[in-house]
Each structure stands twice: as structure tokens, then as C-alpha cells.
């Protein structure tokens, strides 16, 4: 274990990467474009499968962003987690409709598997194979041992629930129980004997599905009894990357709402003149800064090989979930009546935050986990 740097956050390389991502999303992923893709009049039928720009995803792959944290030996770039955090933050700020965050989560899980088959799958991700996790049971449990899928003779049977970006993904990393415990398995989205059923969710920039397996062929990534350990090892990175996306989305909401309160006139004064508006916006800013510090600290502790990575990551996700609810609700409220309409861009980011809020456990769930870690489980 190495000592964590006192000045954690972005180095020169990560700062350049963040600036590059900011310019890319500004040029190619404006709120107006996103609104045109995903927002429709609710009286008109809207497909529950998210509309997204596949050519833009290919550009992301060509920029090397899917490979950023993958080890060089597996065909990646081999940068630290903070590099992916820099990209995820800007992706959240753009509400980028893509399987990027889901693919990062799968990447960290595959890295934790540390097997030849997992390394090969990482190389495929580096070249653009979108991959997502299918690890949740019907009850929505995020525990690594809870799965409704079983494996017998190398074939999967059962249902994986709440699979993120399932309709955009080429592959699934599936947790399944066997005689000797939970293992992890790779399944192609086009494989026989699987059925991907899209679910409706609040977030307009993502899709979600449940996947049924009926003796589906799979490739073992982590042996029975090792799959849950790989998921546990990857969870700090997963929580950190989701929290980074929330930071970016929160910053967009704050910036947009602040600008609106400068131009919206009420009682012959800009809306931002009134303390009832000023003070909550300052609190949102402080909430975002606290979250950002915890996210950067979490990423840095993971990169430095600290022993308290889970503690840091759950602190970051707990704060990020609280920030998401507060920042997005204030953004809607301060936009007034227009904020509740389909014409307003704010609701797209609001809904992304509400989805992120519960993804891999909301603030209450994270604090319960933290209490168990710090105080100990109740008898």
C-alpha cells in the first residue's frame, strides 16, 4: 500500500483529458441536441429504448475513452481512475446518452476478475465493445451475492434485473450462483436463449431492462466463489464513477439555474436578487464542492492502493445522492412553471440525477453500509 497524496485530484494529464472531454461534449452534445433526441410530448408514445447517437459513441471509442483505465497489457491506455472520473464528470454535465458509464462499471469488474478471459474482454472494450453489468436480483439488491441467475454445466438460467443500458450493450457481465458460490460470466447480447425486455425508467438518457436466460451459453470470467469477491473489489470504483457523473450533472444544473435567475425578472428585479433564491443556490454550490472533494479523494485512494477505498467510495456516493436530490429539485423549482414543461432542458438532467441517486444504492443505503463499517453490524 502506498501513501495517498495530500493534494488529491487531477494531474496535468487528467486536466488535459477533462478539457478535451469538455470541448468534445460542447461541440457534439449540446442540451438542444439531447433534448431533440430524448424529450417528447408525453401524450405521444415514446419508445422505452433510449435514442442515442451511435456515431458519437464511435468517436468516443476512437478518442480512447473506453480504454482509458484498462491496463496496457490488456490493450488499454493504463491511466488511473481519476482519468475516467474526469471524463465521467463531463459526460454527466452533457447528460451524454451512451453506454459509457455502464461500460466503465463493467471494466472495473473485469479488472477485478484478473483472469485471461476477463483480460480478453477488456481488450474488446478498449476497441468499442459496449459492456454492462447484469448483477441485480428482482428485489433490486446491490449485494454481490444476491442474484436470481443460476449456472449449471456452463449454462445460465434465470433473470437479471435492472440491467443498465442493456439495449445499447454488446455484452453482459452476469453474476450467477452455482454449487460453489457466485461466479461471473460473459454473455453476448446476440446469444441464443436470452430475452432482453426493456423497462421504463425516469432517466431519458439511459435505458434499462431485465434479461431472462434459458440455458444460455456463457464464458466464465471469475470462478464460482470468486465472482462476488470481484464485484466487491470493483464496487469502490463503480460508486466513484457514478458519483462523478452526478457531480457533472449537478454542475450543469447549478450553472443553468444561476444564469436563469440573472435574467428572469420578477417584481421588477432579477430573480437572483432575492435571498430566498440566493441562499439555496449557494447551498447547492457547497453541496457540489463537498461531493467533488469526496469523489476525487475516493478515486485517488483507489489509485494509491489505500485500504479504506470502500469507506471513501460509499462516503462519496452518499453525499452525491443527497446532492443530486437537492440540486435537481432546486433547479426545477427556481425555473418556475417552465421547469415543469417538456420544452425546458432542466428536466432531462433532473431525471438523470434521480436515476443516479438510487443506482448502486441511495444515500440511506450507503450510510447503513458506512455504519456497519465504522460502528459494526447490529447484533
Indicate where each model-derived feature is located.
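Alpha-helical interface subdomain recognition
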Residues: 1-94, 113-117, 128, 233-379
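Short, flexible active-site-proximal loops enriched in glycine and acidic residues
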Residues: 94-103, 221
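A short, Trp-centered hydrophobic/proline-enriched beta-strand micro-motif
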Residues: 127-138
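A short core secondary-structure module
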Residues: 159-194
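Cytochrome P450 C-terminal beta-domain/meander region
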Residues: 143-157
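Flexible, small-/acidic-enriched active-site or ligand-binding loops
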Residues: 144-147, 162-164, 189-222
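Short beta-strand-to-turn element immediately C-terminal to the catalytic PLP-Schiff-base lysine
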Residues: 110-115, 174-177, 186-189, 212-214, ...
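Structural signature of FAD isoalloxazine-binding scaffolds in flavoprotein oxidoreductases
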Residues: 78-87, 142-145, 187, 215-217, ...
Amino acid at each position: 500500500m502506498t501513501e495517498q497524496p495530500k493534494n488529491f485530484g487531477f494531474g496535468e494529464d487528467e486536466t488535459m483529458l477533462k478539457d478535451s472531454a469538455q470541448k468534445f461534449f460542447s461541440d457534439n452534445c449540446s442540451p438542444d441536441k439531447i433534448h431533440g433526441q430524448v424529450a417528447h410530448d408525453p401524450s405521444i408514445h415514446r419508445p422505452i429504448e433510449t435514442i442515442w447517437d451511435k456515431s458519437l459513441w464511435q468517436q468516443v471509442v476512437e478518442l480512447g475513452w473506453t480504454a482509458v483505465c484498462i491496463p496496457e497489457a490488456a490493450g488499454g491506455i493504463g491511466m488511473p481512475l481519476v482519468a475516467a472520473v474526469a471524463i465521467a464528470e463531463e459526460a454527466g454535465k452533457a447528460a451524454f446518452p451512451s453506454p459509457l458509464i455502464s461500460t466503465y462499471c463493467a471494466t472495473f469488474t473485469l479488472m477485478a476478475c484478473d483472469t485471461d478471459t476477463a483480460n480478453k474482454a477488456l481488450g474488446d472494450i478498449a476497441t468499442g465493445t459496449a459492456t454492462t453489468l447484469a448483477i441485480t436480483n428482482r428485489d433490486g439488491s446491490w449485494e454481490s451475492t444476491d442474484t436470481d441467475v443460476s449456472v449449471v454445466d456452463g449454462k445460465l438460467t434465470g433473470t437479471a434485473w435492472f440491467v443498465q443500458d442493456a439495449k445499447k450493450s454488446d455484452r453482459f457481465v452476469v453474476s450467477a450462483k452455482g454449487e460453489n458460490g457466485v461466479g461471473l460470466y460473459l454473455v453476448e447480447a446476440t446469444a441464443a436463449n436470452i430475452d432482453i425486455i426493456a423497462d421504463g425508467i425516469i432517466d431519458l438518457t439511459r435505458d434499462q431492462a431485465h434479461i431472462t436466460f434459458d440455458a444460455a451459453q456463457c464464458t466464465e470470467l471469475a470462478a464460482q466463489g470468486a465472482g462476488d469477491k470481484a464485484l466487491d473489489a470493483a464496487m469502490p470504483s463503480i460508486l466513484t464513477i457514478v458519483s462523478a457523473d452526478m457531480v457533472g450533472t449537478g454542475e450543469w444544473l447549478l450553472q443553468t439555474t444561476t444564469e436563469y435567475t440573472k435574467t428572469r425578472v420578477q417584481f421588477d428585479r432579477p430573480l437572483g436578487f432575492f435571498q430566498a433564491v440566493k441562499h439555496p443556490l449557494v447551498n447547492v454550490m457547497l453541496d457540489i464542492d463537498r461531493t467533488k472533494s469526496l469523489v476525487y479523494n475516493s478515486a485517488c485512494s483507489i489509485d494509491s492502493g489505500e485500504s479504506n477505498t470502500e469507506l471513501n467510495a460509499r462516503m462519496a456516493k452518499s453525499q452525491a445522492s443527497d446532492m443530486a436530490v437537492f440540486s435537481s429539485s432546486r433547479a426545477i423549482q427556481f425555473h418556475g412553471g417552465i421547469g415543469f414543461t417538456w420544452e425546458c432542458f432542466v428536466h432531462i438532467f433532473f431525471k438523470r440525477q434521480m436515476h443516479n441517486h438510487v443506482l448502486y444504492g441511495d444515500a440511506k443505503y450507503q450510510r447503513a453500509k458506512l455504519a456497519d463499517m465504522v460502528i459494526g453490524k447490529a447484533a
